[in-house]
Amino acid sequence: MHIKLVIFAILLPSSLLLLLMGTTNFQQGYVEAQTNSTQVFTSPNHTFSLNYPLDWEIAPRNSTFPYYGETTALVLRPIMNETVTPLNEIFFSISVSDVKRLLEDNKSLPAEFLDKLVADKISSFEDPSSIYGNLNVKLLGNNYTRLGDHPAKELTFLTQNLGTFEVDTYTIYNDQLYHVNFMGPQSKVSQLYEEFQQIKDSFRFLS
């Protein structure tokens, strides 16, 4: 599982590369053993699947930590032997939203929609009225990538006043906006970024 970070050198911006170097009973889906090190999650409507490590778990919906929103389809987190707090929380989430009407109203192609979505988020980093406005956000990467063999956009940034590292990946598939989010303490990035990439790379659309 510990793949040398040099593998990612040609794929990551230099600032990010330097940073890297320095509930089984889930009612809305199911998991099954796949190998000795991962298990499979398939969404309840069989629209996507992914693999995640055995030392991760599906976050419970009744948790005191606000993992789930209206559009959240899945949240994964490492199994921890300590109390979870906003300062040590690590998670990988997938949210799905219907954007068919927005695409039609704006007469936008999916790629154009994603470009604007990402541009607006970057602008919010400097907007005092936004949730990021006073958090001293440092942008590490704004790149094209793929999610489930589908074109995607990816933002990587530090929220320096909170000490968190975050990756947002967006793609549109069948008029649905898929948002993959990874968040964790900046101090643990080098330990967990590879696992995040492995989970993301295993993502597949099923229908």
Where are these regions (language model features)?
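Soluble non-cytosolic domains of exported or imported proteins
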Residues: 47, 108, 112, 186, ...
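Sec-dependent signal peptide cleavage junction
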Residues: 19-35
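Surface-exposed amphipathic alpha-helical segments
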Residues: 56-58, 176-207
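Extracytoplasmic/secreted envelope proteins and their assembly/folding machinery
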Residues: 53, 115-122, 193-200
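Conserved polar/disulfide-associated segments of primarily extracytoplasmic proteins
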Residues: 62-172, 178
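Hydrophobic membrane-insertion alpha-helices, especially the h-region
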Residues: 9-19
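N-terminal Sec-pathway targeting helices
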Residues: 1-10
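N-terminal "mature-domain start" segment
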Residues: 31-75
